[in-house]
Curated annotation (Swiss-Prot):
WD repeats lie at residues 10-47, 52-91, 95-134, 137-176, 178-227, 237-276, 279-318. It comes from Gallus gallus (Chicken). SUPFAM superfamilies: Quinoprotein alcohol dehydrogenase-like, RING/U-box, SAM/Pointed domain. Residues 403-476 form the U-box domain. Disulfide bonds: none annotated. Keywords: Repeat, WD repeat. The keyword Protein biosynthesis does not apply. The lineage of its organism: Eukaryota, Metazoa, Chordata, Craniata, Vertebrata. GO terms for molecular function: ubiquitin-protein transferase activity. Residues 333-396 form the SAM domain. This is WD repeat, SAM and U-box domain-containing protein 1. It comes from the Eukaryota. Transmembrane segments: none annotated. CDD domains: RING-Ubox_WDSUB1-like (cd16655), SAM_WDSUB1 (cd09505), WD40 (cd00200).
Amino acid sequence: MATLIHTLTDHSDDVNCCAFSSSCLATCSLDKTIRIYSLNDFTELPYSPLKGHTYAVHCCCFSPSGHTLASCSTDGATIIWDTSDGRMLAVLEQPTGSPVRVCRFSPESTYLVSGAADGSVVLWNVHSMKFYRSGNVKDGSLVACAFSPGGNFFVTGSSCGDLTVWDDKMRCLCNEKAHDLGVTCCDISSHPVSDGEHASGCFQMASCGQDNKIKVWFILFADFLGGELRYKCTLSGHSAPVLTCAFSYDGQMLVSGSVDKCVIIYETNTGNILHTLSQHTRYVTTCAFAPCSLFLATGSMDKTVHIWKLDNKQPCAGNTIENDSKIRTAENWSEDDVSAWLCAQGFAELVGLFKANNIDGKELVNLTRESLIHELKMSLWLRSKILQKIEELRMKMVSVPVAVPDEFLCPITRELMKDPVIAADGYSYEKEAMENWISNNRRSSPMTNLPLPSLVLTPNRTLKMAISRWLETQQK
């Protein structure tokens, strides 16, 4: 369930972008300003609004630590701000002077990328705040960008419909015609998945465009292969051009906004529509999940930003880490997993500190009272609370549940199948779940979103026997 809990009405013109840090929400607008709000009560911070651009602000994004914010504008500049007091730290002028449409920090805050209307893309060195490298897309304006989770690669989208994968040396690794009428946005989930061929280095990417579609891709990043894009499926829930899309922090949900004035939340694994939100009165231009996935922000040409609270029963980073059938011990968590765990435990304010110190799962479970005092400078109250939670994690590591093989789980319910059947799309599902799917007048595949050629369900006796044998081995 998604509940509208707050509406921000401070902008005097179209809202173009919104972005979360662990403690703040930033919004930007055609009115030339950026506004910053506290996540505690969604009140505007004392130094907000930020005024430095002379024309419309198209995009804003926080650095991973949340200590800085970048914004870009028609005025050809990308500005870096200090989020502690609103000070302007640097003004990065696009070398060509072209209007800047998009900006993104790399996951390690090493680089900031800015993309412009003339197709130029610039990598800036964040530490020196100086120009590093630049390139150009073949045709059209550069309107979308997303970094790989490792930060060594990034993807750009252009108004001519191309997706281009680059490395941090600005070498073009591959190019894919994705949307006939132009790309509008793209995002990469930070959680690895399997595409059936590669065991690691594979992630999901979403792109959306003027063709009314969202396309989901497998994207492989490897130093020896470069970048590789592989089409997965198309989501066709919108009836008009899709202007924005974003994955939740845990990768389990995908949200999109459209010219049809609707916001749609999809379940990433199946492509099922979880919610359709239709409170905006004009085009939905931007959407973003908070790091812990409990909040969703949507912005529109109606000059408002809606804040939604998602039901705890929805996929959430904290729940996923501890309860997913493919559970991993805490010491194998990535830095993003640690951030999600912090949010789930009520320590969202510590995400920036832990990221700044590169604390992954192994570092987390080995934290001591001394390291919290001397290295992280943590207060007594926080120390005792966080140490208690870490000790609970260590206890859970003593006995980790056995992972259920993914092929034994129903793609719809993500539960162990008891009576598997093969549908016309070639995938196996729990019989009851697939029958419910069909009875709700759904005629598309839960896995591919393509039309089902027939509604015949064939018992998968081979899979049923394999599940039975596996269950027997677990009881020994």
